[in-house]
Amino acid sequence: MTGLFRHRTFLRREDLKGSYDVVIVGGGVNGLSLSHNLAAHHGITDVAVLDANYIGSGGSGRNTQVVRANYNTPETVPLYKASLGIWRTLGQELDFNLLFSTQGELDLCHTHDSLEVEREKSLLNRAFGVQTDVLTPDEVRKACRFVDLTGGGELPVVGASFHPPGSFARHDSVVWGYAIAASRRGVHVHEGVAVTGIEISDGRCVGVRTEAGPVAAGRVVSAVAGHSTVLAAMAGVRLPIETMALQAFVTEPYRPVLEGLVSSMDLYVYVSQTARGELLVGAEVLPYTTYSTRSTFGFLAEASKRSLQILPFMAKARAMRQWTGLCDMTPDSSPILGDSGVDGFSLMAGMGTWGFKGAPIFGQTMAELIATGRTPALIEPFALSRFRLDRMVPDAASAGTH
C-alpha cells in the first residue's frame, strides 16, 4: 500500500550559513516569489530568506486574497496584467494547490463622478487588452441580484464597472507553495531570524547582522512590507513611505450567495465570500501612520454599516473575527522595485494594497534584474528615483481598498 498517498511536505530545515549570494529579508509572498524565481529561472540557489517571525506572518497572511488587473495608469495596467497571467498557471508551476479561482469583480458607483472614473479606466484597460466593462443599473442587477440599487435609500447606484478576470487565491497556500518550491531547489528559508542591521563597506551593502550572527551577501533585498522604512534606514536609505493599517473582518459561514467581489467606489467598502462561506468585508486604509495591528470596534461598526448599504442581506450574518495588516503607502500608490541607490541593496517596497496581486510578476522581474543587472521594462517606471525626478505613477483611485 505504498505510494497511494502523498507524503506531507514541510520546509527543509537548514543551518544558517555565514554567507549567501543573495539574502532576502522578509518571508512574505514577495520575498518568497523572488527566491523561487531566482532558483527556478536563473539557477541562483545560494539564497537565504530571513523572516523575524514565521513565513506569511505579515501582510501576506492578512490580505483579502484579491487578484486583479483593472488599474488606472499606462504603467500599472501592463504590470498587473502580466501578474494575472502568471497567477493562472502558478499552481502548476509550484506543484501546489493555490485555490485560485476567477469569479469577477463588480465595482459599484453611486455618483456620476466615480462612474466617469470607471469609464476612463475601462477604456485604458481595454487599450492594454484587459477586460473591464461599464454597466448600467439594470445590468448591475443581472450581475448580482443581491445588490441594493438604492444604496440603503441614501446613495443610489448609477452604474458600475465589471472586471471579469478578477480572481482570488488562498494567501496561505501561495506563501507555502512558493516557500516549498524554492526550498526544493536549494533555497534556505529561515524563520525566527530577525535582521538587526545592514553591513555597509565602502558604500556597498555586503551583508546583514542578525540575532543569530552576521551573514555576508553578494546582494541584500528588502521585502519587508510594513517595515520597509525601518530596514532601508539601516542601509542609510530614506524611503517616501508611510505605514498605515488596513482592517478586515469575516462573518460566520453563510449559505453561498456571492460570486466574485462586490465593492463600492464611493463607500470604500468591499465584500466577497470565501470558500468556507464566510462573508469577508474590508474598507479603506486608515489615514494615519501606525505600526499597530490592533483591530478597532470603530472599523467593525462602520464597515458593517457600509456593507449593508450595498448588500442588505448581510444583516442576517454575524461577525466572527477581524484583523489588521500593515500597508507601506507611497505618495503615488505604486510599488518601489529595483535598486536603492546603495550598491548591493535592492528594494521590493511600497507594497500598499497591491503587493499580493503583483507578487508573481514582482518576483519574476526582480529576479531578472538581480541575475542580469538589467532592469526589465515592466518595472522601469517603479524605480525609487522616480520621486526625485518627479516621474510618479499616480494610481490612488485603483489602490485605496483592495
Where in the sequence are the language-model features?
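Central helical "cap/lid" subdomain
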Residues: 210-259
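Glycine-rich FAD pyrophosphate-binding loop
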Residues: 39-60
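C-terminal catalytic lobe of FAD-dependent flavoproteins
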Residues: 308-402
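Extreme N-terminal leader/targeting segments of oxidoreductases
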Residues: 1-22, 37-45, 399
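Dinucleotide-binding Rossmann-like beta1-alpha1 core, especially the glycine-rich loop
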Residues: 64-146, 268, 306-308
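Active-site lid/adjacent beta-loop-alpha segment flanking the redox-cofactor pocket in flavoenzymes
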Residues: 238, 253-349
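Helix-loop-beta segment of a Rossmann-like dinucleotide-binding subdomain
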Residues: 17, 98-107, 121, 128, ...
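Helical element adjacent to the flavin cofactor pocket in flavoenzyme catalytic cores
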Residues: 161-218
